[in-house]
Amino acid sequence: MGLQAKSYMDAGKLVPDSVIIGIVAERLEKPDCAKGFILDGVPRTLPQAEALDKAGIVFDHVVSIEISDSEIEERMGGRRVCSACGAPFHVKSKPPKQEGVCDACGGALIQRDDDKVETVRNRLKVYHQETEPLKGYYEKKGVLVPVDNQPTIEATTKVIMEALGI
């Protein structure tokens, strides 16, 4: 199934839901998933959620990290990466010692196309149209766990763990 997905991606096409669900279902059958699993980025649409239901894949919890569009734009728009070694930076939260220069290797810092404001806004538009409705879907099932965004990954992780009782 993975090769099938790769052929779509290599052609610049969206991978059909049936292939995505097949990959997820196949992976969740592995022994290391018997006691639980975490999915990130799946499902992205109501049809995917419904297909997972039909495949018998049940979620105990669905975490929704609540964050404003403006905060997402600021965070993603501020990301930079070294063009030579790939080291990550952020203009506000993790700036390099010298602007535009990687602390690790001296390479030039660039902004990935994915992090440019127009791209982020387009992705947010798609999110609001296709993914946001999942919150209502999982809320009706009683498994939605909304969590307020925190300033750091560590703080957000802590809040999620507390919300899940871990």
Where are these regions (language model features)?
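ATP-dependent small-molecule kinase phosphotransfer cores
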Residues: 1-58, 68, 77, 81-87, ...
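Residue-level signature of catalytic and energy-coupling elements of molecular machines
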Residues: 24, 38, 72, 127, ...
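Generic alpha-helical segment signature
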Residues: 17, 95-98, 153
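Residue-level "edge-of-site" marker
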Residues: 21, 65, 151
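Conserved beta-strand segments of the P-loop GTPase G domain that flank and frequently precede/overlap
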Residues: 40, 64-66, 148
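A glycine- and Lys/Arg-enriched "phosphate-lid" helix/loop adjacent to the NTP-binding pocket
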Residues: 7-9, 59-129
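Residues at or immediately flanking beta-strands
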Residues: 36, 62, 88, 143-146
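NTP-dependent small-molecule kinase module
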Residues: 108-166
